[in-house]
From Swiss-Prot:
Species per Swiss-Prot/TrEMBL record: Burkholderia mallei (strain ATCC 23344)
One MF term in the entry's GO annotations: glycerol-3-phosphate dehydrogenase [NAD(P)+] activity
Catalytic site: K192
Gene Ontology BP terms: carbohydrate metabolic process; glycerol-3-phosphate biosynthetic process; glycerol-3-phosphate catabolic process; glycerophospholipid metabolic process; phospholipid biosynthetic process
Gene name of this polypeptide: gpsA
HAMAP family: NAD_Glyc3P_dehydrog
Major location (coarse): cytoplasm
Record's protein name: Glycerol-3-phosphate dehydrogenase [NAD(P)+]
Disulfide bonds: none
SUPFAM superfamilies named in the record: 6-phosphogluconate dehydrogenase C-terminal domain-like, NAD(P)-binding Rossmann-fold domains
Length: 332
């Protein structure tokens, strides 16, 4: 199978490395210097240093060439750009008249200014296309690149898209599950990043494992309430892309969003944290959108409220936690 991966950050590189073991895989990056470096070193030192890339993986800086690689009906395109870049890539595919027959995205979050989920952006930019979906689940790029076991879910309304994605990814140490709840999968992937900031704050303040468990559990309830309000199915949020991804992101030391929370608890400013991070922390990007949508829909999300208060309103992390503890008692 021919596969094109668009985006050579840590996640795109890791997925391309996995795919190249079985398939004719091409990894596209906008930065020609990065492409040259990848080809010369067989390592993405910028985003995934120390991981040797498969000898069969090829690299490309020209988007039209990369898209042409994935045009056939038995091919697949994987969009590994962040949410902020998804709409532009869809427009580029449309303008180049090279929309792949089947494609999936792996970004998580809401578009900041429009509050759109990824599938809504795709539908707006490519209204005549139908075979697309989202690939998501509990996964750190470095572990995937190292060939460690992982389970992901592809959600799409298109059976053909689900089948192509399964055929491409389901091998080696990667297990793929299929479904059609695109909204539920996307909401889980977005909200868990915000909740991971909350657990990072709690852990950074030394509040203990009981507090962490409470935040994960009540955070899952918030995620599910919002997801159902937006059209997702409740059972999706107890699966890989809901509870599974939340557990990993909230507790794993490779989590950028958890790291943001830990550093906020230590007294660092958000600007300094993001400047030093060097990578996207989607929880920061989409927290306002999540809270805005929740308020609009009448969905109670107190943990998300507390995170936004710390991120954007100057509330001290310990004061935000105290506010949560002072909430009125209620039935679970």
């Amino acid at each position: 199978m021919k596969v094109a991966v668009l985006g050579a950050g840590a996640w795109g590189t890791a997925l391309a490395a996995h795919l190249a073991v079985r398939h004719d895989t091409l990894l596209w990056a906008r930065d020609a210097a990065l492409v040259a470096e990848l080809a010369a070193r067989r390592e993405n030192a910028r985003y995934l240093g120390g991981v040797a890339l498969p000898p069969g993986l090829r690299y490309e800086a020209d988007l039209a060439t990369a898209l042409s690689h994935a045009q056939a009906d038995d091919a697949l395109c994987v969009i590994a750009a962040p949410v902020a870049g998804l709409r532009a890539l869809c427009r580029a595919m449309r303008d180049a008249r090279r929309v792949p027959a089947h494609f999936v995205w792996v970004c998580k979050g809401f578009e900041a200014d429009t509050r759109r989920l990824p599938h809504q952006m795709v539908a707006e930019e490519l209204p005549d296309h139908a075979s697309y979906g989202v690939l998501s689940g509990p996964s750190f790029a470095r572990e995937v690149a190292q060939g460690l076991p992982v389970a992901l879910t592809v959600a799409s309304a298109s059976a053909a898209c689900r089948e192509r994605t399964l055929a491409a990814f389901h091998h080696g140490a990667m297990r793929i599950y299929t479904g059609d709840d695109v909204v539920g999968v996307e909401v889980g992937g977005a909200v868990k990043n915000v909740l991971a900031i909350a657990t990072g704050i709690a852990d950074g303040l030394g509040l203990g494992l009981n507090a962490r468990a409470a935040l994960v559990t009540r955070g899952l309830a918030e995620m599910s309430r919002l997801g159902v309000a937006l059209g997702g199915r409740a059972e999706t949020f107890t699966g890989l892309t809901g509870l599974g991804d939340l557990i990993l992101t909230a507790t794993g030391d490779l989590s950028r969003n958890r790291s943001v929370g830990l550093q906020l608890a230590a007294g660092r400013s958000l600007d300094d944290i993001l400047a030093a991070l060097g990578h996207v922390a989607e929880g920061v990007r989409c927290a306002r959108a999540v809270l805005s949508i929740a308020r609009e829909r009448g969905v109670d999300m107190p943990i998300t409220e507390a995170v936004c208060a710390v991120l954007f309103d100057g509330v001290a992390p310990r004061d935000a936690v105290s506010g949560l503890l002072r909430r009125d008692a209620k039935a679970e």
